[in-house]
Amino acid sequence: MFIPHLARYSAKIAAVVLTCNAVAATAEQRTPYTEAELENAVPMGIPGVRAWADAPLSVLKTQLANLGPLLTGQPIAMLALSGGGEHGAYGAGLLCGWSESGHRPNFDIVTGVSTGALMSPFAFLGSKYDDRLKALYTQMTFHSVFSGNPFLGLFGQGLYSTAPLQRVVASQVDQKLLDDIATAYRNGRRLFVITTNLDAQRPVLWNMGALAASGHPQALELFRKVLVASASVAGAFDPVYIDAEANGHHFKEMHVDGGTAYPLFAVPVRLLAATGEVDGHSDGQDGERKSGQGGHSGGQIYVIINNNLDPAFAVTKPKTFNIAARAFNTLVKASFYDTILNSYVYAKDEGYTFNLAYIPNSFEVKSVGLVDQKYMLALFDLGHAEGVRGVEWQHTPPRLFR
């Protein structure tokens, strides 16, 4: 979740970890399980609430069964929320300001990764939850998210405990919110969150609406666990363990930040392409369609990147840690760009309007540390102002035609 700042210390941490690993012989023991058991595992006794995000299209197709617009033929409005740690304050502000403008859509599909996962339930439910969304990103402080000694954490499972983040999520995600998401799910809308199963090295797509509508007594607990897991950077935070069972064998799955696998889950590429029904033409195996048939023309794809995408020139200091941090930041931008480009190509091919917003280089406020509240307030205000006056959406990836 807080990768941008943690990257500054990644090289130092790696060096110390290599030294300490030999000493850390008291690691927590885990119940072994097999890959075959994982394929059939049911999380916390609640079946039918997830799939591999990189699964074949024929499998992903089931996740959009009974999606409202697919049944009525109406245009689809989709929102994808990226990772970005404390930079999520930008997306939160934009959504709140967009509500105030009176033009924010009622999204049919919302996806969230990492910090985008934390805000996704509120984005999905609309303006009546804007107060919670604002509180989440304007009242957050270092101590409300981080606890523990990072040096002692080198001998554990993460530099920091997820306990404070769990408390933050529990304070905002309650049974009423779960019930509202369940109602939206039954009305044909979909909310998805990505975590990374570290044992499998694969991204997991959680159908949060199906989970909310399951009626299972542990649904709220699992819902919260998924949000925390998606925002828990591996190594920085303890992983989130999710109880699972397969053929009578009980074990714990290890889940971490969804951004480990995907910085952004682009719905059109992995889900809508799977339906084979968006334009009424299914031409081949796995429901793939012929290009250019664009059935739901008029639909909208909105992508909010809680980060900056534009290159920012700076003479890099010739020091190991500065070089590592600069390289990591470059890698993150490149990863975002590739995903955005895929989304744009899909939208153009299928007749959707592509809409992109991200933090501009003109934003010059600097963060002075992890979870800098003043910095987050400035980012929230930036996004909020954009939303109120009318978001100037970019309809192509940056630098594509210039």
Features from the language model and the residues they span:
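N-terminal signal peptide c-region/cleavage motif recognized by signal peptidases
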Residues: 19-22
